[in-house]
Amino acid sequence: MEARKIIITGGATRIGAAIAKKLSGKEIEILIHYNKSKSKAESLKKELQKKGSKVFLVRGDLSKEKDVNKIIKFAKSKLKFFDCLINNASLFENDKIENFTTDSWGKHLRTNLRTPALLSKMFARNIKGKNNNIINIIDQRVFKLTPFFFHIL
């Protein structure tokens, strides 16, 4: 049997790390994306390898197109094809209506919307078989902005 191949964005900490731990084991290859959590990613890699998983780490800022392209290229070179993509990474800066910037707004949209779509497109082009999954995890703040975002008192 060929190994199952999983990509997890934002996989080094919190929910992403918990998912990686739950899915890891023999015959599992996991590519973990991280941005700023290098030491946590490296520690998680060691933990998952002890459970029998083959683990790859890739760093990248999901708001930057060149980093997203690098992640896609790395994923293709290491895994060849994919069984599961978990779009878990997100960006939520603490801002309010009176101080948010168009740069911040754009970074949020690129990280939380555009990049999961681009990664899903790449995934769809590199699947093998029929039992493949894309799981999109989104924070509640997309639906409910920072408390009092539009409240000025």
Language-model-detected regions and their locations in the chain:
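Active-site loop of short-chain dehydrogenase/reductase
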Residues: 4, 53-54, 81-82, 126-140
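Conserved glycine-rich cofactor-binding loop
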Residues: 12-13
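Conserved glycine-rich Rossmann-like NAD(P)H-binding loop of the short-chain dehydrogenase/reductase
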Residues: 28-42
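The beta1-alpha1 cofactor-binding region of Rossmann-like NAD(H)/NADP(H)-dependent oxidoreductases
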Residues: 38, 59-70, 102
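Conserved NAD(P)H cofactor-binding loop of Rossmann-fold oxidoreductase domains
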Residues: 88-93
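Substrate-binding pocket helix/loop in short-chain dehydrogenase/reductase
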Residues: 96-97, 104-109
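Catalytic loop of short-chain dehydrogenase/reductase
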Residues: 133-153
